[in-house]
């Protein structure tokens, strides 16, 4: 079975991704696009500051085909540099500011970055990595602007922008949207060294429009602005179905902008929908809930660990009656968390889970956004416009609805493969346009996708498949368990034993938790039973909210404790 999108195909204009910024500056003008710690930046102000960055890059000889690295947390300076790089016709490579120098150097060298904008606290990693890179310019900024003494061969961002023109240079309009790269986006690296994904302007604009049109019922349009052609949304759906009109949305921005979810969902989509983003550089559940109340946010967004933390602090929340919808990505929301969110925020809350990968720019499926739509808990929704999903067997055969297999994706947002990795590109992207994701999923008869697990996470015990996500959902339903992750311990000819890492509420004692797990084991099939349980302070997650199972495997004690019997 191949599931196809119920949405009409989109007429994506042949324009650079930066046309979104032009359209937003013209349409929303002096309205606030970003708010952080009392400071605001308007849509027009973002265009003007980004234009100054583009002119500064041109003065350095940086333009089409060159790569600019952004090595800083979510902040207005990040957005300015991101859009400025695109206005210059250059390519952005986002880099996690917490990367170790060796990993940062590997990314900068692989991408061929010639300019990097770093955060003051993260600058030492850049300086340590610099000798192994092609960097010609190192820029720095911080929470309070430029540092007083940036250091030798380092330029403060404010000084770099001083005196630059505030109108777009226009060179971005010369790029080929189908060939020129907007992003060299590096994968999350949850299973090893990150790979650079080649994301064109067409991919970025397409996926941003797929998400924005899905959430508003609108269609793309091109408008003439004083800055050049701009892309906007037209003919949105009725307020009775899409209760947040264009230009009225407010959201907390915590998804890291150096990750696909943040780059597209946090930097691009809000410019189409006219959403004000309250920027948080890091996730703090109390601060998140305080700002959600203060700014009367209309939507909550995050990943499952975010919602687990918000639920644990719900007693600190104020009035959240303004919240109309909730979006989640990075991993499937456990059923227990969905039930708790509805109990807290109301049964009419629109909960929309999505599924995607860096290799598809961001999103492949989204839960229906219209109020009256059929939402199916436990699924990650339907294919977005122009997208197909199929489930394939071990030999590439197409499987029927209800059968578990590898998820394949085909659509206009599927990227061009990995940078300088032809063998890995050929293995993941086939000649018919399908991306082989490495995820295990199931399609139902109506095309709703359910993600079962990662193929790499699946355990094999005595010939049986054991899916960690299934065990994790069962563990999260136990009293007092606030976090759960299951990994495998190799045990020779038997394959792997399932091992659980748990976090618990502060008032729950270890004996109670272990007794609950023993009770769960009695209800499981023999090959599913958890052989070890380790209570830890926190489940390690990536910046995108994905559990770092390799870190947990490294924590497995050696030798293993005596395992439970089957």
Please annotate each region the language model reported:
Residues 13, 32-75, 100-105:
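Conserved AMP-binding/adenylate-forming core of the ANL superfamily
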Residues 59-60, 87, 91-164, 506-509:
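Structural core segment of the AMP-binding/adenylate-forming
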Residues 99, 106, 116-119, 411, ...:
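AMP-binding/adenylate-forming catalytic core of the ANL superfamily
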Residues 166-186, 193, 243-250:
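Conserved pre-ATP/AMP-binding loop-to-beta segment of ANL
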Residues 205-253, 258-298, 313:
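Conserved AMP-binding/adenylation subdomain of ANL enzymes
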Residues 382-386, 394-428, 448, 464-466:
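Conserved ATP/PPi-binding loop(s) of AMP-dependent carboxylate-activating enzymes
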Residues 522-547, 565-566:
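AMP-binding/adenylate-forming catalytic domain of the ANL superfamily
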